[in-house]
């Protein structure tokens, strides 16, 4: 009985198959990550509010260009937690909290969060949760942006002319790819350097 | 730093709706939301909005009090209405022609309908928010609706930290100013400083998250079946609220169907 | 877990067999070859240098260690003969951060959380919650919001949450490190009462030995390599290991590290016997060194508040004041504003070159708020803060009107939490940030720094000097967030010093620090005093006040 502690840390759940089961630390970090994304999004909308409302009055689809800010929780959650469902859980919870902080969205945030989280989740599912590189992140962000446009066009923008809906979709996809995709990958890398991800799948350093 | 204080995510709770069970309120709000989201015509949405206002006035939240507290919601609804009026291809006589902006009677009607709908969608969310305790809501979600307890409780614990994060945000602003950060000029400088501040908040919050996970795990969280110290209870108030909500949802549909105006969003 | 009806001695035995821990990516193991047993009911104080793996050991005993790749541990740990992870509810664990030991938003729910997880039947939960709250002397309604608690109360709440689970082994990881003196004593008393009454086995990690000495009966001291250096009865071990402990920076009872006193050139009037209110604006009787004792910053009739006017109102105030100042008119003083709810009022003080001023007072007396107001980071609720020309050096005489660049070269503020002030990805860049900022400004405008604009070479030399003096040279390329607590504290002070401000304002600089970091900080501050820098420290630390020969301003009396 010299080496009994060779199992994974965390919960009793964490002891069996490691890759795909959620430990307590994964769940709690995912939830807090969603919360902090919501707070940052709220600050970001406060900062951009004059700009965004002015541009929304001048040319509504331009709002799609900053839509990526709304989607960061999904990709960041997937990149950090690296568990099936992480994107969906983070994006849904963040959307609900963003809805609470901003209050002008109503319960449709639940639908929005599900649709957008699903977009990210699908991309990582296609890699079977094995690839978390810059490309995957960017594609995930873009798909999430596209899903956002589809959802918004259906739920809110249905009166818009079709070409305007398309412009909006292009804008949100771009914004998703850049802000929620590529940028979040760099954020994940910067977070790895700080050591705060040490307990998570994304932060585990290699053994020498 | 400024007086940007934490928004009252969950305001003071009193009155009939506050005593109703959160799950009933949530499901009711979702039902009304669903009816409005799927319906594009102003009659359905107008009746739904009116019904909600009557219900809220009945429990002591008059339209004036709502307006003074919720003007950003009204503003957002107006902005989205304007956007639609601009971009709708509904025809009719031209009312305004300004550069690329063309507004016709048809598009103005569409815009007005969107603004009305925006208000009607926002209201159920706000109502639940103003009258519900998050802990009670979590109890209901896990015990009544059977959502996974580990995720619901982690979300509840994370929600408590939102307030801590908002306070920390303003401390961070001062702490970084003391180092001379944010010296960059123009919008780019503002963005860079925002990014830096957000990153530090992210680091702090993730640190907190791993410590919180440790605390929760040490208290036996996630180890197996658990009991609940609080039980959600359902009473006469809930029946009343349920009936009112169904009446609003069904009434809105019934009126617009009777008038022949009902239209789904895909129609 | 079936609840035990019998509250008789219930401690469990703890066994460690050749236990070690090596985090992936680290050069050295945190713990090596620890073999010992702890008898049921034994109370142990675990000491050692920071980074020696004390926390890791406690986490392993609690079964909550966060092992990144599942291969960090070696050897064997048992609690009551089984793996700690199979002994949920047997072990109670507390760490030092109050904010993350509160889980739920109501006091009662928070204490009940652990009982729910142990599947205690509902009818037993609430009596046990009340009993646990009584036990830690926290008489609050069950609905009381947890956000309204002080740090010390939060820690006692956490203890109640742990004790309600009726643990048979209590593990405490620096439970009082983030709590003020009174809070620490109350917590300690609550722990002592609980473990003695139930005969619970206890292991506590804490570098404030005096606090726990009366409670524990055995002391284990780890060395730098994570091995057991001393192990034995409290008195004997503390005596035998005293030298090693002092070297490691443990606060052994009756000892304060010796530091050099400030030179105090310039016989200014500031002394411990004079109140700052006594010399309102009186000119300083000539000091022997030019500048020493000279007033750099003063406050008159000052009231301070955390509640600030809206951002736009502050910007308007700033524009108006700057316009008045450019036209040579007096700066407007802040009028009484009831909306701002001052936490402290009627403050008169002078901050003098080469002198230290300690701001003391009970929690909530407005000490930190005063510090931030003096630093120009908050606007006064009433009265004024004025910078003398020697400090303002061409800028407006009110610090709250300075922009970030003007601020760093004049007033350096060290916040209580070092990580809040980190801006760059490496230690070196962090230190270079301030000077670079100044140089960029100097290139842009005519803003002056003390003794003209430093050249790049001067900056590099200053950064190198700071790295060496603060023992951070080996870590120059490390990410600031990865440093230990003491290293972060030293870095946060160094980053501010890198911009060579004439006034240094520190919020609880020595709080929770080990004796080694404490001595280094004091040496650094004394050196700054000797250079003619004015030091303002918000502190509870009597030893610090004595070491800096600081004048004391007591708030809230």
Predicted regions mapped to residue ranges:
Chain C
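Conserved ABC ATPase signature
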Residues: 145-149, 153, 479-483
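Conserved beta-strand-loop-alpha-helix hinge in the C-terminal portion
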Residues: 226-249, 546, 556-557
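Catalytic Walker B motif of ABC-type/P-loop ATPase nucleotide-binding domains
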Residues: 170-174, 179, 504-507
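Helix-to-loop junction immediately C-terminal to a conserved catalytic motif
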Residues: 62, 375
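Conserved ABC ATPase "signature" region
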Residues: 123-141, 299-302, 445-475
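ABC ATPase NBD Q-loop/coupling interface
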Residues: 76-87, 384-406
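Hydrophobic anchor residue at the start of the ABC signature
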Residues: 159, 187, 493
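ABC ATPase C-loop
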Residues: 162-163, 496-497
């Amino acid at each position: 009985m010299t080496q009994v502690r060779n199992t994974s840390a965390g919960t009793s759940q964490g002891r069996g198959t490691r890759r795909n089961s959620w430990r307590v630390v994964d769940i709690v970090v995912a939830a807090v990550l969603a919360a902090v994304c919501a707070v940052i999004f709220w600050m970001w909308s406060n900062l951009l509010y004059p700009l965004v409302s002015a541009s929304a009055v001048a040319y509504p689809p331009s709002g799609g260009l900053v839509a990526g800010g709304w989607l960061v929780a999904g990709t960041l959650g997937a990149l950090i937690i690296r568990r099936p469902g992480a994107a969906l859980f983070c994006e849904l919870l963040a959307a609900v909290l963003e809805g609470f902080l901003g209050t002008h969205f109503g319960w449709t945030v639940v639908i929005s969060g599900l649709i957008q989280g699903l977009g990210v989740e699908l991309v990582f599912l296609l890699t079977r949760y094995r690839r978390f590189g810059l490309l995957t992140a960017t594609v995930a962000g873009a798909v999430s942006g596209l899903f956002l446009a589809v959802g918004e066009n259906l739920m809110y923008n249905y009166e818009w002319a079709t070409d305007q809906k398309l412009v909006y979709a292009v804008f949100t996809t771009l914004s998703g790819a850049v802000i929620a995709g590529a940028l979040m990958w760099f954020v994940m890398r910067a977070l790895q350097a700080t050591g705060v991800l040490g307990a998570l799948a994304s932060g585990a350093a290699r053994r020498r | 730093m400024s007086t940007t204080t934490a928004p009252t995510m969950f305001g003071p709770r009193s009155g009939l709706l506050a005593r109703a069970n959160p799950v009933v309120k949530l499901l009711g709000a979702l039902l009304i939301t669903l009816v409005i989201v799927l319906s594009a015509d102003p009659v359905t949405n107008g009746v739904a909005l009116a019904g909600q206002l009557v219900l809220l006035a009945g429990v002591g939240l008059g339209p004036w009090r709502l307006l003074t507290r919720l003007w950003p919601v009204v503003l957002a609804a107006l902005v989205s209405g304007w956007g639609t009026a601009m971009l709708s291809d509904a025809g009719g006589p031209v009312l305004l022609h300004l550069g690329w902006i063309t507004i016709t009677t048809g598009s103005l009607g569409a815009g007005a309908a969107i603004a009305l709908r925006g208000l009607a969608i926002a209201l159920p969310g706000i109502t639940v928010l103003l009258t519900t305790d998050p802990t009670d809501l979590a109890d209901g979600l896990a015990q009544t609706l059977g959502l996974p307890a580990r995720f619901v409780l982690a979300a509840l614990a994370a929600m408590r930290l939102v307030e801590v994060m908002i306070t920390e945000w303003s401390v961070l602003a001062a702490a970084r100013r003391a180092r001379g950060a944010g010296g960059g000029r123009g919008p780019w400088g503002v963005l860079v400083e925002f990014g830096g501040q957000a990153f530090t908040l992210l680091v702090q919050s993730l640190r907190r998250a791993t410590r919180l996970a440790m605390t929760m795990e040490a208290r036996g969280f996630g180890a197996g079946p658990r009991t609940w110290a609080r039980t959600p209870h359902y009473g006469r108030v809930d029946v009343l609220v349920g009936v009112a909500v169904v009446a609003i949802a069904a009434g809105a549909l019934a009126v617009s169907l009777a008038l022949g105006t009902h239209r789904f969003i895909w129609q | 877990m079936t609840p035990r009806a019998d509250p008789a001695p219930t401690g469990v035995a703890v066994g460690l067999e050749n236990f070690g821990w090596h985090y992936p990516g680290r050069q050295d193991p945190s713990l090596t070859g620890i073999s010992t047993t702890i008898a049921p009911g034994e109370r142990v104080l675990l000491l050692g240098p920071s980074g020696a793996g004390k926390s890791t050991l406690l986490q392993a005993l609690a079964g909550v260690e966060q092992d990144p790749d599942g291969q960090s541990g070696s050897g064997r740990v048992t609690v009551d003969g089984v793996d700690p992870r199979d002994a949920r509810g047997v072990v109670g664990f507390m760490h030092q951060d109050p904010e993350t030991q509160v889980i739920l938003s109501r006091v009662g729910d928070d204490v009940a959380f652990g009982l729910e997880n142990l599947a205690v039947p509902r009818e037993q939960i609430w009596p046990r919650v009340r009993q646990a709250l009584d036990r830690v002397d926290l008489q609050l309604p069950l609905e009381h919001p947890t956000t309204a608690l002080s740090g010390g109360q939060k820690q006692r709440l956490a203890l109640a949450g742990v004790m309600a689970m009726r643990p048979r082994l209590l593990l405490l990881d620096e439970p009082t490190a983030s709590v003020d003196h009174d809070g620490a004593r109350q917590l300690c008393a609550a722990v002592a009462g609980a473990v003695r009454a139930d005969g619970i086995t206890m292991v506590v990690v804490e570098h404030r030995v005096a606090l726990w000495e009366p409670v524990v009966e055995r002391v284990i001291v780890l060395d730098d390599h994570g091995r057991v250096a001393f192990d034995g009865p409290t008195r004997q071990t503390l005596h035998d290991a005293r030298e090693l402990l002092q070297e490691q920076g443990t606060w052994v009872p009756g000892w304060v590290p010796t530091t050099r006193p400030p030179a105090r050139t310039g016989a200014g009037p500031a002394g411990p016997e004079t109140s700052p209110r006594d010399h309102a604006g009186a000119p300083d009787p000539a000091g022997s060194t030019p500048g020493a004792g000279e007033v750099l910053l003063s406050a008159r009739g000052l009231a301070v508040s955390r509640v600030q006017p809206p951002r736009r109102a502050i910007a308007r105030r700033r524009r108006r004041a700057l316009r008045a100042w450019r036209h040579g008119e007096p700066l407007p003083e802040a009028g009484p504003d009831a909306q701002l709810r001052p936490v402290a009022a009627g403050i008169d003080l002078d901050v003098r070159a080469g002198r230290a001023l300690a701001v003391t007072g009970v929690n909530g007396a407005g000490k930190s708020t005063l510090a931030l107001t003096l630093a120009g980071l908050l606007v006064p609720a009433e009265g004024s803060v004025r910078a003398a020309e020697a400090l303002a050096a061409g800028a407006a005489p009110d610090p709250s009107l300075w922009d970030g660049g003007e601020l760093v070269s004049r007033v350096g503020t060290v916040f209580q939490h070092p990580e809040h002030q980190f801006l760059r990805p490496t230690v070196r860049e962090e230190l270079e940030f301030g000077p670079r900022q100044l140089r960029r400004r100097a290139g842009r405008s005519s803003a002056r720094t003390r003794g003209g604009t430093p050249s790049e070479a001067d900056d590099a030399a200053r950064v190198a000097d700071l790295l060496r003096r603060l023992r951070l040279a080996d870590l120059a390329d490390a990410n600031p967030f990865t440093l230990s607590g003491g290293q972060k504290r030293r870095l946060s002070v160094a980053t501010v010093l890198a911009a060579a401000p004439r006034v240094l304002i520190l919020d609880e600089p020595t709080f929770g620090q080990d004796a080694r970091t404490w001595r280094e900080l004091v040496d650094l501050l004394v050196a700054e005093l000797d250079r003619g820098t004015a030091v303002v420290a918000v502190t509870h630390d009597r030893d610090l006040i004595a070491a800096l020969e600081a004048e004391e301003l007591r708030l809230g009396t």
